[in-house]
Amino acid sequence: MSDFWDRNKGSIMSGLATAGKQGYKGTKFVAKTGYKAGKQHYNSSKNKREGNSNNSSSSDLTISSPPPLTADVSNFPPPPVKPGQNQYHGSSRGGSGNVPPAATSRTSSTLPSSYSSEQNPIIPQIGNPQAVPYQVPAPVPQYTTADSQAPHIASRAATIVPGTQLPISSHPNNTAPATYNTRPVPLPHRAPDNNAAAGLVADPQLLSNTSLPRATRQLLTIDTASIATQNPNISQEAFAVPPANTMASPFPQTTHASYLAASQSPVQPESIASNKVSEPTPAVPAVPTRTYVRAPAALPVQPLPQEERQAMPQAMPQVMPQAMPQVMPQAMPQVMPQAMAQTSQPFPEENGVSDVQELKSPTSATTVKPYSWKDSEELKESLRIKIQNVDISSLPTPPVHRNRSESPSSETSSLRSKIKSRSQSPSGLKSPTQSTAVNLKTTETGKAMSTSRQTPQQTGRSSREGEGANNGIAGRYDSSVQVNFPPPPKPSRSETQTPANRDMRSSSSPPVKPTTAPRAPPRLPSRSVPSQPPVTSSVPKLSSTANGKADRENIKPKSAVSGAYNYDIKVDFQPPPKPFRKDKESSQQAPRSVPSFEKPSKYGPPPASNAETAQGRSIRAPPQIPSRAASLDPPPAYDSSHSHAPSAPPASNVELQSLSASSIQAGAEKTVKVAGSTIQIPKTKKAPPIKKALPGSLQALDTHKSNPEASAHLTEKGKKRPPKPAKKQSLMEQPNKTASNGGNSRGNFDQELEARLKSRSFHEKPAAVPSLVEHSNSFISSGKIKAAAPPVKPKIPIRLASNEALQPNEQAEVKDDSDGDNPFRRYLKNAVPSENDRLHKN
């Protein structure tokens, strides 16, 4: 392999050179092509941005194709019209040039398409009218004159060679004749007939009127449908006279007189052929104009003044369809100088746009009100609805309510007079009858004053309604009735003890406790006694408000309940119980395990000594704790009836938490002397161990069947309570009190023991109550509480009997077994029979 390079060196080098040359050529070609394409694209985009055409470099790529040869829409005939429908008008369009658009669009919409060109000088000549075939309804020739120099146009008349005919457009789709003029061709000067010149020239004021709105100054159109049907042999002739000097008069006007000069007598073809028109040399080339062949429609025009109506012929709708094409060449030479003289001066128009007045066509029957410019304020005033001003003094007075005065001023004056008279007179010391009489007098005077100010019509109405003083709220008011009943109570009146409440309280039996006095019930709204007739008037209310203190002193005790109340009946029933108050009841309620013989509700009120000791215990509870352990008898059997109504412990028991067990044991060895004998108090037993709290689902159960001594150590919040002695203090203090009484102490003690034995004999043995578990099960089964959720099963640990590695199926089995709640565990076990580990052998 060492001689490989030596043998192939030449071929390798020549191949590399050839490849390099070809690659260079290709790269160069690609670069040049890309550069050219980029440059052309940049230039084309630049020209597009600047609005220029494509430059020469991009002309070889973008070839502009000529537009397709389509027919000119302006040469088409109008579309067919339904019977009974008016044809629409097409808007005329003018060619583009240096002349303003207003000057190029002033030809009638009924003329055929006419083109003017310097390159095609064709002079139309009038020949035999029968030589021209009639294809479409002949349009009415239009003659436009806009030059102010009428004599020059008349002198430049071209001669029309007889025997020739008008050329017809060679366009395949155009059936309307077209006239191609290179220069203006004026009409021949010919004397018109008598009928044509007799009052058929339009009023000069009509031509010079430019104050009409722009919308109504449009081109004139004449219905030519009847012309074609009545005169089919008339040649289609078009005479167009463009302005000779466009710059001098850029706003050409249409001469209406040329349309109005018509005659009833037809003109012979020989007279038309004999006319000679000279062809003048125009100073300015004519602007090519294009018009549409359209049938007329009803156009709204402004109604002409009376003078213009008189100038127009009345027989125009009957004469024009028959004689217009024949008479127009005859009447035009005489009418044109007059029309040009009227339109010689240019009209001042805004924005370089002029308008031409439009005459009403014979078929139009509708008119539109022209727009008249007004200022915004004037327009608002004109559009505002005018309301006639009504004289208020001529209107009758409105009706007055029978329970009201006719004027509010009279009411206020009467009220002021009442207040003034009441303030001046010492009405507070008067009786209700006197104050009522004074108020009635002031009412009469105020009413008289108010009626004196009224008009005679008002006084007549008030006299018809009734007398001044007797005109009350409704009906007649009797001022002689004694009005001495008390006023109604105030809404914010405090609860005071009325004499009726005092009598009821004195007649009732005294309460057991001094703090259980019943609260006075709220007063009901007082109502009128049915024995007295109800008298409603505003006068007593005013007196009662002013003399409130004096009236309250004279108020007699009155019941809050409607109807007559007998105060002689003795009311001896007990007052209603006080509303429940937790703070007072907890401090005043008897202890939970008080023996039944001390209950005052069954065996009468307790002795005063017990009440005193109960009060003293509630105040000085801690020093008396050792004496609670002293007892003559063992603790009584637990009564289940007390546990059903558990009460909150006294407020003094909260202080017992600070006491230690040593102080209780130290006082346990004390002795008590009872009737000369010494009794040693045994030591108290230790408190039983505290039970654990029940779960949350069982705390709502009735747990009164448990040990009361154990449950007493648990408070609502789970705190430990102090150890509770077996006996209450009242049992230990009673012998001490009786021992100090003297000779009667022994008898009292025996009575206490007998009462105690009787109270024990009265109570029956409590019925066998099921245990807590049975009670809770029955409570749960009754549906009052839901059973607790079962405990979660612990995961079953799987221990392998051997140290062999687990196969994949065994691992999946172990994973499934780890889920204790998997119901499909039975189906996953041994799904695949296990095999011995043949790969990992020991």
Curated annotation (Swiss-Prot):
UniProt keyword terms in alphabetical order: Membrane
Protein known as: Altered inheritance of mitochondria protein 3
Region (Disordered) location: 1-25, 39-134, 338-368, 393-769, 799-842
Compositional bias of kind Low complexity: 52-64, 104-117, 406-416, 525-540, 638-652
Biased composition (Basic residues): 718-727
Annotated GO CC locations: actin cortical patch; membrane raft
Major localization listed first in the record, in broad terms: membrane
Compartment(s) where it occurs, according to its Swiss-Prot or TrEMBL record: Membrane raft
Organism: Lachancea thermotolerans (strain ATCC 56472 / CBS 6340 / NRRL Y-8284) (Yeast)
Keyword Membrane: yes
